[in-house]
């Protein structure tokens, strides 16, 4: 007669695989203000999860984590999208995008089928991710720098119409 093993609870056993490790990263970033990958690695190590910088960097990228600085330009903290999933359309995405536009959009500009959005330093990736997740039919995609997002409009929408829409949503 064989005995079934009980499922492990949170700890190194669960985090031994990529999904478990990434779940712990999301939990840590959701509950603590982590300012560096070294700090995150130390927090994981305290839980018995050893990770290389390369693996941690890859995990953060896959989770869509970005380092977000406030408008004062101070030291940034890592944040992950609210649901911790890869970028794709999500329910409630437009509400979240509108909230982030209100918090992060500094100004807009446009040219042809392009809208240019300005944010505080370090916030562009976070806002661009929210725009991508909203899966707006008039948006082909986004490209984000440190404080600037290039949003490509799907024809027949123009960049001016798109910039106006983002202004009105904030």
From Swiss-Prot:
It comes from the Bacteria. SUPFAM superfamilies: C-terminal domain of arginine repressor (SSF55252), Winged helix' DNA-binding domain (SSF46785). Pathway: Amino-acid biosynthesis; L-arginine biosynthesis [regulation]. The keyword RNA-binding does not apply. GO terms for cellular component: cytoplasm; transcription regulator complex. InterPro entries: Arg_repress (IPR001669), Arg_repress_C (IPR020899), Arg_repress_C_sf (IPR036251), Arg_repress_DNA-bd (IPR020900), WH-like_DNA-bd_sf (IPR036388), WH_DNA-bd_sf (IPR036390). One of its GO terms (molecular function) is cis-regulatory region sequence-specific DNA binding. Its main location: cytoplasm. GO terms for biological process: L-arginine biosynthetic process; protein complex oligomerization; regulation of arginine biosynthetic process; regulation of arginine metabolic process. It is found in: Cytoplasm. The keyword rRNA-binding does not apply. Keywords: Amino-acid biosynthesis, Arginine biosynthesis, Cytoplasm, DNA-binding, Repressor, Transcription, Transcription regulation. Regulates arginine biosynthesis genes. PANTHER family: ARGININE REPRESSOR. Belongs to the ArgR family. This is Arginine repressor. The gene is argR.
């Amino acid at each position: 007669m064989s005995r079934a093993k009980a499922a492990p609870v949170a700890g190194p056993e669960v985090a031994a695989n990529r999904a478990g490790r990434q779940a712990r990263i999301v939990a840590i970033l959701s509950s603590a203000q982590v300012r560096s990958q070294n700090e995150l690695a130390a927090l994981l190590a305290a839980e018995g999860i050893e990770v290389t910088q390369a693996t941690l960097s890859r995990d953060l990228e896959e989770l869509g984590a970005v380092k977000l600085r406030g408008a004062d330009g101070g030291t940034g903290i890592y944040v992950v999208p609210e649901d911790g999933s890869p970028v794709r359309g999500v329910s409630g995405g437009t509400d979240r995008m509108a909230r982030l536009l209100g918090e992060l959009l500094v100004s807009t500009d446009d040219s042809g089928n392009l809208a240019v959005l300005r944010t505080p330093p370090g916030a562009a990736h976070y806002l661009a991710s929210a725009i991508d997740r909203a899966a707006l039919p008039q948006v082909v995609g986004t490209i984000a720098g440190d404080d600037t997002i290039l949003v490509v409009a799907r024809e027949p929408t123009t960049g001016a119409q798109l910039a106006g829409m983002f202004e009105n949503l904030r």
